[in-house]
């Protein structure tokens, strides 16, 4: 996880395109590894809920991208029913699981759950607007990022 760059996920664990499901994982940095924890909170560092939402949104975004072979890109359009169910601390490892519940009219909607040691810490419904990439270079940059996260591409990244 690279909080300051909003690269929230460490790895794409599994993508099942037929089932329209994804699993991702991330480890929250130690408190001394990120200035985020200097203010949230002094003496009791907690992962901000808004950054947990970003973890869920990135998980849903990778799935939305995968379902269209990275031919168009997801742009965050909405977050519904976001819930933070437990404090997340520096050093915690989280696994996110998501699945698509709707695709159509240029939108993809997914449900995402975050867990630590099998217990729920957060969940939300994430909506994406699916749009063309602004240029081929940006599409390649996103595919390269997916490859760094170990997305299981069937063909070489172009």
Give the location of each predicted region.
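Conserved positions in beta-strands of structured domains
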Residues: 10-13, 80, 85, 99-101
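Compact, glycine-rich, soluble single-domain proteins
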Residues: 39-48, 52-61, 76
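HotDog/MaoC-like acyl-thioester-processing domains
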Residues: 90, 100-158
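Hydrophobic beta-strand-centered segment that forms part of the acyl-chain substrate-binding groove
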Residues: 59-95, 123-131
């Amino acid at each position: 996880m690279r909080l300051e760059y909003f690269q929230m996920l460490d790895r794409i664990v599994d993508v099942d395109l037929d089932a329209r499901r994804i699993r991702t994982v991330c480890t929250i940095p130690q408190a001394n590894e990120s200035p985020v924890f200097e203010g949230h909170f002094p003496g009791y560092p907690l992962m901000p809920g808004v950054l947990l939402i970003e973890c869920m949104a990135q998980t849903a975004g990778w799935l939305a991208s995968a379902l269209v072979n990275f031919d168009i890109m997801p742009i965050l359009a909405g977050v519904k029913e976001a819930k933070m169910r437990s404090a997340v601390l520096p050093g915690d490892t989280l696994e996110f699981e998501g699945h698509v519940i709707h695709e159509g009219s240029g939108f993809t909607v997914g449900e995402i759950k975050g867990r630590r040691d099998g217990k729920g810490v957060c969940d939300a419904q994430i909506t994406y607007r699916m749009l063309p990439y602004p240029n081929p270079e940006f599409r390649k940059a996103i595919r390269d990022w997916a490859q760094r996260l170990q997305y299981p591409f069937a063909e070489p990244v172009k």
